[in-house]
Structure formats: C-alpha cells, structure tokens
C-alpha cells in the first residue's frame, strides 16, 4: 500500500508482472498482493487464471505472449478496462537458450531477443500511456548481461540490451515522472537453475561471497522496494549475494 496525497488514506497500487506463472514473477505478484495491492499476472500458461486466483482475490491473469504484438495490445486493453491505469510494470518474462556460437541457431537468437528485449520494449510502449506520474517500471536483468559466460551469447546479449533500454527509458520517461530501473538477480533457486548439475551448482556457489543461492522471495522484496523508491531511476540493483564482486 502507498499513502494518498492527504497522507491518511492508503491507496492500493496496480501492478502488472510478466512471466508470473512461476519463479521470481510469481513471488513478486504474491508479495504485492499480500501487501494489499492489485495485481495482473501475465504468462503463456493457459491456466494463468487459476494461478491468479490462488494468489489472491485482487489478482487476475492474462494468458499472453509478450513476443506477440497483438497479445501486448490485448494485455493493455485488459488493464485499462479493469483499472483504468497502471502504477507498476515488472518486465520479468524471460527465455534462456544456451549453447556456444557454433551451436546456436538463428531461431534461438531471435526467440531470446524477442522475449527478453523486444518484449519489455513492447510492454512499456503499450502501457506507459496508462501510467500516472510516479509510475514505475522494473526490468529484471541478469548477471550474464554484465559478465561474459561461455555458451550464453543469446541470453547475455538480450540482457545487456535490456540494460541499455532501461537507461534510455529512464531518461526519456523522467519528464513524465515515470521511473525505470533494473533488478539483477544472481544465482536463484528457480526451475531454470534446477536443471544445473550438482558440480556446476557447487562451482557457482563457490564464487558467491554469501555462499548460497538466492530465493525468489528475496528477489521479490528487492523488486518491491525498487518499485516504490521515489528518487531512483536509471539504477541497476544487483541482488546476487556479492557474485558480481567476485567474478
């Protein structure tokens, strides 16, 4: 909840979180809902409405793909019809396609860029007109967008591009008092990292000063704080247990 201008009446913020059927996106949506805010969750899962209902009564779901222009238009129309506006947009939807340069296909490259970079651009473009002064965009980045890891050309390039987009939009939208920031999770316990071998997992944890993986709930808390920080824009917030300091 945030305070109304008179300082007395609490006002529920209106959130939209992409990639929210599981993982970090789901945790962000659940946290916002638990604190009294209204939430729209977006995901390709056809059961997204049921997932929304399981989070809370003020949560609704839209089954959509951020890589499809028509779907993004439909998302914006749903939000406008329900709420008439939007306060916080969290661009969390992500796709990881790994492989060395000699193995990645054009389809891998294009699909990753479409989800991780073009998707957030389309979402901001479609929804920024619904955001009042004080609105907030939180883009979810990745450490690989700042440090080179072999076999991560697609993912690394897409997340590096998202950093650039964050910087440009922060400046461009500041005149409307809309803030744009990036949260960069480190090695987090999600379905994506669950497939990593024990050996690889131990090697990564060995580089993290705090010597453990992060949780989706910890990432959600940071997204919540960044979304509500009124004098922060164009910032990159690493939430990685110190990993970036030790690479």
Listing of model-derived features with the role each one plays in the protein:
Residues 21-22:
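Conserved glycine-rich cofactor-binding loop
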Residues 100-101, 105-113, 204:
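Substrate-binding pocket helix/loop in short-chain dehydrogenase/reductase
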Residues 129, 171-175:
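Alpha-helical segment proximal to the catalytic Tyr-Lys
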Residues 130, 178, 212-239, 244:
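C-terminal substrate-recognition "lid" of short-chain dehydrogenase/reductases
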